[in-house]
Protein backbone atom coordinates (compact mmCIF):
# COMPACT_ATOMS: atom_id res chain seq x y z
CA UNK A 1 0.00 0.00 0.00
CA UNK A 2 1.22 3.48 -0.81
CA UNK A 3 0.00 7.04 -0.38
CA UNK A 4 0.70 10.45 -1.88
CA UNK A 5 1.03 13.02 0.91
CA UNK A 6 1.49 16.78 0.92
CA UNK A 7 3.78 18.47 3.43
CA UNK A 8 5.89 21.59 3.23
CA UNK A 9 4.35 22.58 -0.11
CA UNK A 10 5.60 19.42 -1.83
CA UNK A 11 4.09 16.03 -2.64
CA UNK A 12 5.70 12.69 -1.75
CA UNK A 13 4.83 9.09 -2.65
CA UNK A 14 5.34 7.01 0.50
CA UNK A 15 4.94 3.41 1.62
CA UNK A 16 5.15 1.85 5.08
CA UNK A 17 8.75 1.37 6.23
CA UNK A 18 10.27 4.05 3.97
CA UNK A 19 12.43 6.95 5.08
CA UNK A 20 11.87 10.33 3.42
CA UNK A 21 13.36 13.81 3.78
CA UNK A 22 10.78 16.60 3.95
CA UNK A 23 10.88 20.33 4.66
CA UNK A 24 11.61 21.02 8.34
CA UNK A 25 8.80 20.12 10.76
CA UNK A 26 8.63 21.51 14.31
CA UNK A 27 8.77 18.16 16.14
CA UNK A 28 11.26 16.44 18.44
CA UNK A 29 13.38 13.48 17.35
CA UNK A 30 11.52 10.28 18.21
CA UNK A 31 8.12 11.97 18.24
CA UNK A 32 5.31 10.35 16.24
CA UNK A 33 3.39 12.68 13.92
CA UNK A 34 0.20 12.18 11.93
CA UNK A 35 -0.03 13.59 8.40
CA UNK A 36 -3.65 14.08 7.38
CA UNK A 37 -3.09 15.76 4.01
CA UNK A 38 -3.33 12.57 1.92
CA UNK A 39 -3.95 13.22 -1.78
CA UNK A 40 -4.19 9.60 -2.97
CA UNK A 41 -4.07 6.04 -1.61
CA UNK A 42 -3.30 2.96 -3.70
CA UNK A 43 -2.57 -0.72 -3.26
CA UNK A 44 -1.44 -1.84 -6.70
CA UNK A 45 -4.81 -2.85 -8.15
CA UNK A 46 -6.84 0.24 -7.29
CA UNK A 47 -6.16 3.91 -6.65
CA UNK A 48 -8.31 6.20 -4.52
CA UNK A 49 -7.80 9.86 -5.46
CA UNK A 50 -9.15 12.63 -3.24
CA UNK A 51 -10.81 15.87 -4.27
CA UNK A 52 -8.38 17.28 -3.19
CA UNK A 53 -7.87 15.10 -0.07
CA UNK A 54 -8.91 11.53 0.70
CA UNK A 55 -11.36 11.79 3.60
CA UNK A 56 -10.37 9.82 6.69
CA UNK A 57 -6.94 8.83 5.38
CA UNK A 58 -3.88 9.43 7.56
CA UNK A 59 -0.18 8.57 7.51
CA UNK A 60 1.70 7.95 10.76
CA UNK A 61 5.41 8.73 10.81
CA UNK A 62 8.22 9.02 13.35
CA UNK A 63 10.81 11.81 13.27
CA UNK A 64 14.23 10.19 12.82
CA UNK A 65 16.51 13.23 12.49
CA UNK A 66 16.84 16.90 11.61
CA UNK A 67 19.59 18.21 9.36
CA UNK A 68 20.68 20.46 6.52
CA UNK A 69 21.03 19.70 2.81
CA UNK A 70 24.22 20.42 0.89
CA UNK A 71 25.06 24.06 0.29
CA UNK A 72 23.68 25.72 -2.83
CA UNK A 73 25.99 28.46 -4.07
CA UNK A 74 24.58 31.54 -5.81
CA UNK A 75 26.84 33.77 -7.91
CA UNK A 76 25.64 37.02 -9.51
CA UNK A 77 27.78 39.10 -11.83
CA UNK A 78 27.34 42.15 -14.04
CA UNK A 79 29.76 42.20 -16.93
CA UNK A 80 32.16 45.09 -17.32
CA UNK A 81 30.94 46.74 -14.06
CA UNK A 82 33.19 44.91 -11.58
CA UNK A 83 30.12 43.70 -9.65
CA UNK A 84 30.18 40.22 -8.18
CA UNK A 85 28.01 38.82 -5.42
CA UNK A 86 28.35 35.41 -3.79
CA UNK A 87 25.77 33.84 -1.54
CA UNK A 88 25.17 30.38 -0.09
CA UNK A 89 22.14 28.61 1.34
CA UNK A 90 21.56 25.35 3.22
CA UNK A 91 17.93 24.22 3.43
CA UNK A 92 16.89 22.45 6.64
CA UNK A 93 15.05 19.12 6.49
CA UNK A 94 13.38 16.55 8.71
CA UNK A 95 13.84 12.84 8.06
CA UNK A 96 10.71 10.75 8.65
CA UNK A 97 10.21 6.99 9.01
CA UNK A 98 6.76 6.05 7.69
CA UNK A 99 5.05 3.70 10.15
CA UNK A 100 1.53 3.09 8.83
CA UNK A 101 -0.98 4.21 6.23
CA UNK A 102 -4.64 4.22 7.26
CA UNK A 103 -7.23 4.71 4.53
Swiss-Prot record:
The lineage of its organism: Bacteria, Pseudomonadati, Pseudomonadota, Betaproteobacteria, Burkholderiales. GO terms for molecular function: rRNA binding; structural constituent of ribosome. Belongs to the bacterial ribosomal protein bL21 family. This is Large ribosomal subunit protein bL21. It comes from the Bacteria. The keyword Ribosomal protein applies. The keyword Kinase does not apply. Part of the 50S ribosomal subunit. Contacts protein L20. It comes from Acidovorax ebreus (strain TPSY) (Diaphorobacter sp. (strain TPSY)). InterPro entries: bL21-like, bL21-like_sf, Ribosomal_bL21, Ribosomal_bL21_CS. GO terms for cellular component: cytoplasm; ribonucleoprotein complex; ribosome. Keywords: Ribonucleoprotein, Ribosomal protein, RNA-binding, rRNA-binding. This protein binds to 23S rRNA in the presence of protein L20.
